[in-house]
Amino acid sequence: MAVYTDVSDDDLTTFLEGYDIGRLRACKGIAEGVENSNFLLVTDRGPHILTLYEKRVNPDDLPFFLGLLRHLAARDIPCPQPVAGRDGAVLHTLCDRPAAIVTFLDGVWPKRPEVRHCAQLGEALARLHLAGGDYAPTRRNSLSVDGWRPLFDAAAERADSVKPGLRAELETELDALEALWPHDLPTGIIHADLFPDNVFFVDDTLSGLIDFYFACDDFLAYDLAVCLNAWCFEGEREFNVTKARHMLTRYEKVRPLSDAEFAALPLLARGAAMRFLLTRLYDWLNTPPGAMVRPKDPMEYYHKLAFHRAVSGPGAYGLSR
């Protein structure tokens, strides 16, 4: 979460007149994140989150995202619920931006995830995948394998300024991923960005999943691969197989992986690492000095990609068949 658009008191007051959430007591910008402008609203009925959707979010996708939150919340997935205005709509306009209010979730995200966090994350992810199974709207994953080549092309000319030889390495890896990428794994709704800062815990118990604005239809096991990258490394290079084992084991207690999904884990993990390497590389090269959000180091995912390329098989992630 972050703040890119300032909202005046008058504009906010007028906007909130369209809702029945109580009298506003305080409004505070939330600094974390990279995509949208977010504010904590405190009223005499409790806290809510106000989001203004910035230019990187396609307004046409917002009904999909907000509808998904409603769908998942109705199936006991701990995620924010969109709040309807007095007109019955959940999407409105504030400061020339699409805007929505969602319920507030208690909890904090784990700065240093431990095994118990990874285990609960695995179970929650499997429950999310099952709960999304009957969500009718669809959204293509624009950041899957078909989207990596355009990202690479946009960054290729300056890639070697980040690491000498990076351009050639990435092109070789892209060629391999495009040739090997599977086509017939189980698909469904995935979160696609379930990093630790998007998962809340209260007293070490998982309490919420947030930031569904990359959610889409794709391979369910790809979502697991994203989480293996985001949760199971100590630093940039040391893979913690114990964390991975607990994550995957708890996932499989709810939704067992098919043999094909299990066999594809190393390839999917390579792809997930490539996805975040490329988006970080693009942002690293194109974020101007003095920008409010500091770009994340793409080399973290270069090292993670190297790990996945070197594994001997899916057993490297702690499970065996």
Swiss-Prot record:
EC number in record: 2.7.1.39
Pfam families found in the cross-reference section: APH (PF01636)
Keyword Transmembrane helix found: no
GO molecular function, one term: ATP binding
Catalysed reaction equations from the record: L-homoserine + ATP = O-phospho-L-homoserine + ADP + H(+)
Family the UniProt entry places it in: Belongs to the pseudomonas-type ThrB family.
InterPro entries: Aminoglycoside_PTrfase (IPR002575), Homoserine_kinase_II (IPR005280), Kinase-like_dom_sf (IPR011009), Pseudomonas-type_ThrB (IPR050249)
Pathway info: Amino-acid biosynthesis; L-threonine biosynthesis; L-threonine from L-aspartate: step 4/5
The protein's name: Homoserine kinase
PANTHER family: AMINOGLYCOSIDE PHOSPHOTRANSFERASE DOMAIN-CONTAINING PROTEIN, AMINOGLYCOSIDE PHOSPHOTRANSFERASE DOMAIN-CONTAINING PROTEIN-RELATED
Keyword Nucleotide-binding applies: yes
CDD domains, A to Z: HomoserineK_II
Keywords tagged on the record: Amino-acid biosynthesis, ATP-binding, Kinase, Nucleotide-binding, Threonine biosynthesis, Transferase
Annotated GO biological process: threonine biosynthetic process
Gene3D superfamilies assigned: 3.90.1200.10, Phosphorylase Kinase, domain 1
Originating species: Rhodospirillum rubrum (strain ATCC 11170 / ATH 1.1.1 / DSM 467 / LMG 4362 / NCIMB 8255 / S1)
EC class of the enzyme, as a word: transferase
